[in-house]
Amino acid sequence: MNREQHGARHVPVLLERADELLGPALTEPGAVYVDATLGLGGHAEHFLTRYPGLRLVGLDRDTEALRLAGERLAPFAERITLVHTRYDGIADALGQAGLPPTGSVSAILMDLGVSSMQLDEAERGFAYSVDAPLDMRMDPTSGITAADVLNTYSHGDLARVLKNYGEERFAGKIASEVIRRRAHKPFETSGELVELLYATIPAAARRTGGHPAKRTFQALRVEVNGELDSLRAALPAALDALRVGGRIVVMSYQSLEDRVVKQELAARTSSRTPVDLPVELPGMGPEFRLLTRGAEKAGEREIAENPRAAPVRMRAAERIEAAS
């Protein structure tokens, strides 16, 4: 699929709301916008067009996404720096753009999870609706695949991954069946795994909670790509990069991600004065203030136009004090 085809199918999620939240930090001359999950560049193109003085630092671990985004953003070539890295590489990416890792950024967007392009390309193995190689790597140039996890992990490690990252009730039962089947034939395709899940998860449980493969595929994807560990490292680095008045928007698509984001923002919006002191110490107040009340969701109209917006949870914050 070429850039035009991808662009026609990719609709940026919560674009107008992201602009409302980030826009006040992007109007000043020389503002720096970091898109930590560049994807096909839909959000970035919007901001570069709307804010003519804006400078973009775009990150993505997917080399094909970077290539396509580079083509899409070619009209803004003098204002962009694109870096092949995970979002926890934000400090190094800023360095490549000639910027310090702290206090140099006006706005940051993190649109987490698997991209539309990755879901649409069957050979990437992210979708359980088509039979494809069990890959699931966001960076197809490195790392283990989902097949490697299924074919080499111990029963205990498999059950841990399925339970912790997929919140799968039948993690132990599924792990046992994986071990049994791989002794006869290693797993190669998503269809083999989907068939196992239909056979292993009780019929009553399959009737609720969506597709029976949803939780297992999520767990494998998170494990293969180190998504939660990367997010835990990325959020502090992203928040540190923001100048006073700088803003961040994070969009999560599953509860595990949103929980990490919620906890980090809660910590950064709390007073830094020791709890046993009766008054707030100068310079020890909260570094950030929340811009959203809880996690915001897409409206019915947007979900109807773009079904992939249905699970999104958006949180945002603004730096109000310099880092101590």
Curated annotation (Swiss-Prot):
GO CC annotations on file: cytoplasm
Top-level enzyme category: transferase
Enzyme Commission number: 2.1.1.199
Primary localisation category: cytoplasm
Reaction equations catalysed: cytidine(1402) in 16S rRNA + S-adenosyl-L-methionine = N(4)-methylcytidine(1402) in 16S rRNA + S-adenosyl-L-homocysteine + H(+)
Any matching Pfam family: Methyltransf_5
GO molecular function annotation: rRNA (cytosine-N4-)-methyltransferase activity
Keyword Nuclease carried by entry: no
One biological process term in Gene Ontology: rRNA base methylation
SUPFAM superfamilies assigned: Putative methyltransferase TM0872, insert domain (SSF81799), S-adenosyl-L-methionine-dependent methyltransferases (SSF53335)
UniProt keyword terms in alphabetical order: Cytoplasm, Methyltransferase, rRNA processing, S-adenosyl-L-methionine, Transferase
Location relative to the cell: Cytoplasm
Binding positions (S-adenosyl-L-methionine): G41, G42, H43, D60, Y87, D111, Q118
Function recorded in the entry: Specifically methylates the N4 position of cytidine in position 1402 (C1402) of 16S rRNA.
Family: Belongs to the methyltransferase superfamily. RsmH family.
Name of the featured protein: Ribosomal RNA small subunit methyltransferase H
